[in-house]
Amino acid sequence: MKRIIVWLAVMMYTLSGYAQNAPWNFQSKVVTDTLFSKVLNSKRAYTVFLPKSFEQNKEKKYPVLYLLHGMWETNPVWTERGHVKDVMDRLVASGEACEMIIVTPNAGGNIHLEWNGYFDMPGWKYETFFYTEFLPYIAVSYTHLRAHETRSN
């Protein structure tokens, strides 16, 4: 019995060391936060995927991908059901994708008052918020670039 316990302990120690060195075991992270919008007069939630090297090299210019959720969804849907962190860690480790920042804003409003979505409509100026407040905020907070430098046209 003692031999089995020692053998299991050695195996677990060995496997944990392997897992720490596995190429897909990145230390990327997902951050969820809010930004107060003057345009919408409310806090708007967003989720950001930050690559492994972000903490070590915050001055690096990362490309930014904005993923928008669908109707009845919110900002964490891409991390919870889309598994953005796991997918990106594996794609970067395999060389199929470059390191990037992925941002998922919450465009959901009050669905009972027809305030919902990514476009400007009476009582809901989300598009104005997105271009005049959100993009510049993300650019300064996470990429150290001007908003137009973080996206393609």
Task: State where each predicted segment sits.
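Conserved small/polar residues in nucleotide/adenosyl-binding loops
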Residues: 143-150
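Short beta-strand element of the alpha/beta-hydrolase
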Residues: 60-70
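Typically the conserved alpha-helix immediately C-terminal to a functionally engaged Cys/Sec
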Residues: 80-82
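Bacterial Sec-dependent N-terminal signal peptides
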Residues: 1-21
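Cell-envelope and extracellular/periplasmic
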Residues: 68-75, 139-142
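Cap/lid segment of the alpha/beta-hydrolase catalytic domain
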Residues: 74-77, 89, 96-129
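A domain-start/cap signature at the N-terminus of enzymes
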Residues: 19-62
